[in-house]
Every structure is written in structure tokens, then in C-alpha cells.
UniProtKB/Swiss-Prot annotation:
<comment type="similarity">
    <text>Belongs to the serpin family.</text>
</comment>
<keyword id="KW-0325">Glycoprotein</keyword>
<feature type="site" description="Reactive bond">
    <location>
        <begin position="26"/>
        <end position="27"/>
    </location>
</feature>
<feature type="region of interest" description="Disordered">
    <location>
        <begin position="1"/>
        <end position="28"/>
    </location>
</feature>
<dbReference type="GO" id="GO:0004867">
    <property type="term" value="F:serine-type endopeptidase inhibitor activity"/>
</dbReference>
<protein>
    <recommendedName>
        <fullName>Alpha-1-antiproteinase 1</fullName>
    </recommendedName>
</protein>
<keyword id="KW-0011">Acute phase</keyword>
<dbReference type="GO" id="GO:0006953">
    <property type="term" value="P:acute-phase response"/>
</dbReference>
<dbReference type="GO" id="GO:0005576">
    <property type="term" value="C:extracellular region"/>
</dbReference>
<keyword id="KW-0964">Secreted</keyword>
<keyword id="KW-0722">Serine protease inhibitor</keyword>
<keyword id="KW-0646">Protease inhibitor</keyword>
<dbReference type="InterPro" id="IPR023795">
    <property type="entry name" value="Serpin_CS"/>
</dbReference>
<dbReference type="InterPro" id="IPR036186">
    <property type="entry name" value="Serpin_sf"/>
</dbReference>
Length: 53
């Protein structure tokens, strides 16, 4: 069977392919101010123990 007609043409790398990606403009995240004490506990159900307190 002749597969030469189905071959994908090779392309060379251009200058644009080697440049660094462009910077994506992003806004700063909202500022979070906590005025009261709080407790955060991360608990693992498999081991039945706190992972972070």
C-alpha cells in the first residue's frame, strides 16, 4: 500500500515559535481583612486525624 500521499508535511520552526509566551494581564486579588480570631482544621476521614490546625 502506498502511504506517500497521506504523509504529513514537515514545517520548520519560525522565529515566532521560539519567542517567550506573552504576558497575560491580570488584576490583583481582592484584599481580605479578618477582624476576628478563627480556627481552621483540615481533617482526614481515612486516618480520622487532623492534618492541619
Amino acid at each position: 500500500e502506498d502511504l506517500q500521499g497521506d504523509a504529513v508535511p514537515e514545517t520548520s520552526a519560525t522565529k515566532d515559535d521560539n519567542e517567550x509566551p506573552e504576558m497575560i494581564p491580570m488584576s490583583l486579588p481582592p484584599e481580605l481583612e479578618i477582624n476576628k480570631p478563627f480556627i481552621l482544621i483540615i481533617y482526614d476521614d481515612n486516618t480520622k486525624s487532623p492534618l492541619f490546625v
